Amino acid sequence: MTTLFISDLHLDPARPAITELFLDFLRTQVRGSDALYILGDLFEAWIGDDTPSTAADAVAVALHAVADAGVPVFFMAGNRDFLVGETYAQRAGFRILPDPTVIDLYGHTTLLMHGDLLCTDDTAYQAFRAQTRDPVFQAQFLAQPLAARVAFAQQARAASQARHAELKQGDQSNVETVTDVSPAEVEATFVRYGLDRLIHGHTHRPAIHTVQAGGNTCTRIVLGDWYEQGSVLRLDADGVSLEQFAL
């Protein structure tokens, strides 16, 4: 049996082909698995479970069908969809996990994260994250009319795009450093949890890394994004496989 991990699909009405690819993935590649873990940024944006979206409705139906077929589905919020709540979770048939989460995978204790907490060199983002993950902020935001939430999301996206454009105009190596994980934070995370395997997304740099932490040899598995292709990590008792598949 196999456990599947995906992240960073960034499903968006402007990119319907990726949504169709994901729905096909759920129909053809997930049934019979031990579990499906979605480690954040399933959606490009999420401003409340009450937001009308035919694409999100279709995804919920497809995910619930997977769960109904006996495959548990787990969701961990990313930096784009941290406002996904229990209302949508019930519609989609998945369980929301905190970030980080520790699970047992075929006898191997493993840490799961979205990955943005590891990007500590991006101090501006970490400050934004702390603000937007605050329960009081979220309650106040979700209490606003839909139009106000849409406007806020558009402003936040524009600010993010402007900041990334500004970074790209500078030293390219600095861009890579700021937008990738901090090696020191990765090492500290392994030591903090006393584990030797971590699976995360967020950076869109799929790879399997060997890390030395606390005198131990550890493995960091980075999931791929779904911008121009599909990407999945298949993990079983015998090993792991990072795979991509075309539109």
UniProtKB/Swiss-Prot annotation:
This is UDP-2,3-diacylglucosamine hydrolase. Mn(2+) 1 binds at D8, H10, D41, H204. It is found in: Cell inner membrane. It comes from Xanthomonas oryzae pv. oryzae (strain KACC10331 / KXO85). It catalyses: UDP-2-N,3-O-bis[(3R)-3-hydroxytetradecanoyl]-alpha-D-glucosamine + H2O = 2-N,3-O-bis[(3R)-3-hydroxytetradecanoyl]-alpha-D-glucosaminyl 1-phosphate + UMP + 2 H(+). GO terms for biological process: lipid A biosynthetic process. Pathway: Glycolipid biosynthesis; lipid IV(A) biosynthesis; lipid IV(A) from (3R)-3-hydroxytetradecanoyl-[acyl-carrier-protein] and UDP-N-acetyl-alpha-D-glucosamine: step 4/6. Keywords: Cell inner membrane, Cell membrane, Hydrolase, Lipid A biosynthesis, Lipid biosynthesis, Lipid metabolism, Manganese, Membrane, Metal-binding.
